[in-house]
C-alpha cells in the first residue's frame, strides 16, 4: 500500500507557453489565482510534499511556499525534463507529476493511481480519460502521460533515456511496468483533464465544473 506521505507531488510549469504567446502559463489567472497556485492547492491534500518545476520567474513561484527547481536539461526539453528534475529532488518513494495547465484534475488522482500501482505491482501508474476524436467525434479513452505516478528508483533509467536524446514520455514509460487508470467512471468529472493551451481555452475552463 502506498500512503499519502509516500508521495511527493511535482507541478510541471517549465514550458515555453508558446501557444499562449510565450507567457509563463503557470502564472496566468484562473478563478482569481495563478494557475500553478490553484494546482498546488488542489494537489496538496493528495500528497505528502509538493514542489514546482519552473524555468522562469522563479521568485514568483517560490512565493507559493514550496521548493522550486528548474530543468537540469537545456533549452526547454519538455515534460520529461521536469520528470527528471523531480526524480532527482524527490525524497519519498513515489513522485506524482501534474501539469500546471489542467486545473480541474481529479481530487482523488493520487489515491487512484497509487491503488493501481499497488494492485498491479507497477513502477508507473498513468491516468487516462475520455476524449472525443476531432475527425469523427468518437469518444475514446486516451492516456494522459503528464499525469504519472513514478517510483523514484526509475531515476537511473530516465537519466539514460534523456542522455540518449529521448524526449517522448510514452517512449520511456513503455520500457517499464505501467498501470493505466481510466477516469471514466460514474461521478468522474468529464472535464477533469481539459487543459488550457491558449488564453481563450483558459477562460473557457473557468466556467466548467467546480469540484
UniProtKB/Swiss-Prot annotation:
It comes from Acidovorax ebreus (strain TPSY) (Diaphorobacter sp. (strain TPSY)). SUPFAM superfamilies: Nucleotide-diphospho-sugar transferases. NCBIfam families: molyb_mobA. Keywords: Cytoplasm, GTP-binding, Magnesium, Metal-binding, Molybdenum cofactor biosynthesis, Nucleotide-binding, Transferase. GTP binds at residues 12-14, 25, 53, 71, 101. One of its GO terms (biological process) is bis(molybdopterin guanine dinucleotide)molybdenum biosynthetic process. Transfers a GMP moiety from GTP to Mo-molybdopterin (Mo-MPT) cofactor (Moco or molybdenum cofactor) to form Mo-molybdopterin guanine dinucleotide (Mo-MGD) cofactor. Mg(2+) binds at residue 101. Belongs to the MobA family. It is found in: Cytoplasm. GO terms for molecular function: GTP binding; metal ion binding; molybdenum cofactor guanylyltransferase activity. It holds the Pfam family NTP_transf_3. It catalyses: Mo-molybdopterin + GTP + H(+) = Mo-molybdopterin guanine dinucleotide + diphosphate. Its EC number is 2.7.7.77. It comes from the Bacteria. Monomer. This is Molybdenum cofactor guanylyltransferase. One of its GO terms (cellular component) is cytoplasm. The N-terminal domain determines nucleotide recognition and specific binding, while the C-terminal domain determines the specific binding to the target protein. Its cofactor is Mg(2+).
